[in-house]
A protein has these predicted regions:
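Conserved class I S-adenosyl-L-methionine
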Residues: 35-45
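Conserved SAM-binding motif I beta-strand of class I
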Residues: 61-66
């Protein structure tokens, strides 16, 4: 299906973004054995992933974080702040070690200068991994967007230190020409 078709399908289903189909595909592939009580959505704007999680797992507590504004999603606790300040957000910090799922579709604003963009992406990915290590419970799951670049192997090795399982996914809903991929880890 073409990217525009995914966007149209998302709109028809009431979702804010086609990225929901990327998350749905990854969750279907990993077939989680449990329900998610607490979910942390990092880089949540415009809110499609939070919206999808809340719709699929109605009794889940969803905590969303982004530096950008996000229109409210029913039942989602949104915090306009940086991932760097997550430990200062009381409602999230009190659940340290109690999240079943950390999802991150976060990406920096791209400059067009490859070396700078790769470094910025890598830095955000490292912060996401650190948050997941600290906030996930045992057997918790992390799903994180990254990009195919020369830092991917380093990123995977870093994840393998703290996660029992590490896998890479390229969802069908991702644009074919995009270097975007997703890393999945089980703590």
């Amino acid at each position: 299906m073409h990217a525009d078709n995914w966007a149209n399908k998302a709109k028809q289903m009431g979702y804010r973004t086609r990225a929901v189909f990327k998350l749905e595909e990854i969750l279907n592939k990993i077939k989680p054995k449990k329900k998610y009580k607490n979910v942390l959505d990092i880089g949540s704007a415009p809110g499609g992933w939070s919206q999808f999680i809340k719709k699929k797992y109605r009794n889940t507590n969803v905590y969303a974080l982004d530096i950008l504004d996000m229109e409210p999603v029913d039942g989602v606790n949104f915090y306009k702040d940086s991932i760097e300040n997550i430990d200062n957000i009381f409602e999230i910090n009190k659940l340290k070690g109690a999240f079943n799922l950390v999802i991150s579709d976060i990406a920096p604003n791209l400059s067009g200068i490859g070396a700078i963009d790769i470094e910025n992406i890598f830095e955000l990915n490292q912060m996401t991994i650190n948050v997941a290590k600290n906030y996930l419970n045992s057997d918790g799951i992390m799903i994180m967007k990254t990009f195919q670049n020369n830092m991917l192997k380093t990123l995977r090795k870093e994840m393998e230190i703290s996660f029992k399982v590490v896998q890479t996914f390229k969802p069908v809903a991702s644009k074919k020409q995009s270097g975007e991929i997703y890393l999945f880890g089980v703590k």
